[in-house]
């Protein structure tokens, strides 16, 4: 049977499948046509995300049904070198006790006029883990 897969760009892909095919199988056919790895594909039918181990018949997908293809959301871990760089610029600071301005690590007086260039500064507190 023939089904259609609509991408976010509006492009429609036609696939030749059987109702006994698994969602994994459909994703690999999409990879063959479009080059998108299956682990980045999310298929939606009737408002539900399709699970990899199930078959097309489990979701009542019949001939000429349209599936919607969306890509997995990216994100997650920050690379350790970037985390160290960010902590150097964000965590190793001095804080003015009067106006709460962030100051360079070696500062002795506040740079702001509103607190009268106060010498009452403290190190910035460490982030909780």
Swiss-Prot record:
Cross-link (Glycyl lysine isopeptide (Lys-Gly) (interchain with G-Cter in ubiquitin)): 6, 11, 27, 29, 33, 48, 63
Family: In the N-terminal section; belongs to the ubiquitin family. In the C-terminal section; belongs to the eukaryotic ribosomal protein eL40 family.
Keyword Chloroplast: no
Domain of life: Eukaryota
InterPro entries: Ribosomal_eL40_dom, Ribosomal_eL40_sf, Ubiquitin-like_dom, Ubiquitin-like_domsf, Ubiquitin_CS, Ubiquitin_dom, Ubiquitin_ubiquitin-like
Sequence ranges assigned to domain Ubiquitin-like in this UniProt record: 1-76
CDD domains registered for this protein in UniProt: Ubl_ubiquitin
Name this protein carries in UniProt: Ubiquitin-ribosomal protein eL40 fusion protein
Gene Ontology terms for molecular function: protein tag activity; structural constituent of ribosome; ubiquitin protein ligase binding
Swiss-Prot/TrEMBL GO biological process terms: modification-dependent protein catabolic process; protein ubiquitination; translation
Pfam families: Ribosomal_L40e, ubiquitin
Keyword Ribonucleoprotein applies: yes
Keywords for this protein: Cytoplasm, Isopeptide bond, Nucleus, Ribonucleoprotein, Ribosomal protein, Ubl conjugation
Cross-link (Glycyl lysine isopeptide (Gly-Lys) (interchain with K-? in acceptor proteins)): 76
One Gene Ontology cellular component: ribonucleoprotein complex
């Amino acid at each position: 049977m023939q089904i259609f897969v609509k991408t976010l760009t509006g492009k429609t892909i036609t696939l030749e499948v059987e109702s006994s095919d698994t969602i994994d199988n459909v994703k690999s056919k999409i990879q063959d046509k479009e080059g998108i790895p299956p682990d980045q594909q999310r298929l939606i039918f009737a408002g539900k995300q399709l699970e990899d181990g199930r078959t097309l018949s489990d979701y009542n997908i019949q001939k000429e049904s349209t599936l919607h293809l969306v890509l997995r959301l990216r994100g997650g871990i920050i690379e350790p070198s970037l985390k160290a760089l960010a902590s150097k610029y964000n965590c190793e600071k001095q804080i003015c006790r009067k106006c709460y301005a962030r100051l360079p690590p070696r500062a002795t007086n506040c740079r702001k006029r509103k607190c009268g260039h106060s010498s009452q500064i403290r190190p910035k507190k460490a982030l909780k883990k």
